[in-house]
Amino acid sequence: MRLRRKAWARPELESDPKVIYNPMHYKENWQEAFGNNHPVHLELGCGRGQFINQCAELNPHINYIAIDLYDEVLVKALRKINEKALHNVRVIPMNIAKLESIFKHDQIEKIYINFCNPWPSRRHHHKRLTHPQFLSVYKKLMKDHSEIWFKTDDDELFKDSLKYFAEAGFIEKYRTFDLHQSEFTENIKTEYEEKFSNQGVKIKFGIFVVNKGRQN
């Protein structure tokens, strides 16, 4: 998805202290960014922020970090944060490929990957956020026995990702090929999820557990 650049977006982000442009400063101590030592959960590709905002509102004792590359969607996420006066969310405008530069090992307790680009062409598979090269990074940055929650509308991406997680040494805790008809009760919908579901598209979902004792 390519977005038309909005000249007003960057100044609005830069004027808000909840938006972090120097995340490397907090690499050793993300508690400093929040002013507490609550667990850190991370959403990779937060889009317009409906999901992360509802998570933060329901779980005030968890610190949420929302990452996206596009200022235009981050502004919309930030506005939702401010409308609800949420103090447990921070926003980082950056490329997800740079995660290792801003987090130390064993720091993150949960990662959410919602409706990422499926990159259907085989020559682009390495760009998928569930590709083994990304999973190996997440695994280092996450605490042992922590979880990745992954949702997608794309059948091929989901099937391939099941293999990716297994190859990377994650333990599959839960999977469904039709989330909205499943027994899973903790789901929070994203904007894309509502759109796809209204079109009759089945949502695929899985929970994968970090096992640092299992070699990939």
Curated annotation (Swiss-Prot):
Binding positions for S-adenosyl-L-methionine per the UniProt entry: 43, 68, 95, 117
Catalysed reaction, written as an equation: guanosine(46) in tRNA + S-adenosyl-L-methionine = N(7)-methylguanosine(46) in tRNA + S-adenosyl-L-homocysteine
Principal EC category: transferase
Key words, A-Z: Methyltransferase, S-adenosyl-L-methionine, Transferase, tRNA processing
Residues the record lists as binding substrate: 153, 190-193
Entry-linked InterPro entries: SAM-dependent_MTases_sf (IPR029063), tRNA_(Gua-N-7)_MeTrfase_Trmb (IPR003358), tRNA_methyltr_TrmB_bact (IPR055361)
NCBIfam families, sorted: PRK00121.2-2 (NF001080), tRNA (guanosine(46)-N7)-methyltransferase TrmB (TIGR00091)
Pathways involved: tRNA modification; N(7)-methylguanine-tRNA biosynthesis
Pfam family, one: Methyltransf_4
GO cellular component: tRNA methyltransferase complex
Name of the protein described by the UniProt record: tRNA (guanine-N(7)-)-methyltransferase
Family in the record: Belongs to the class I-like SAM-binding methyltransferase superfamily. TrmB family.
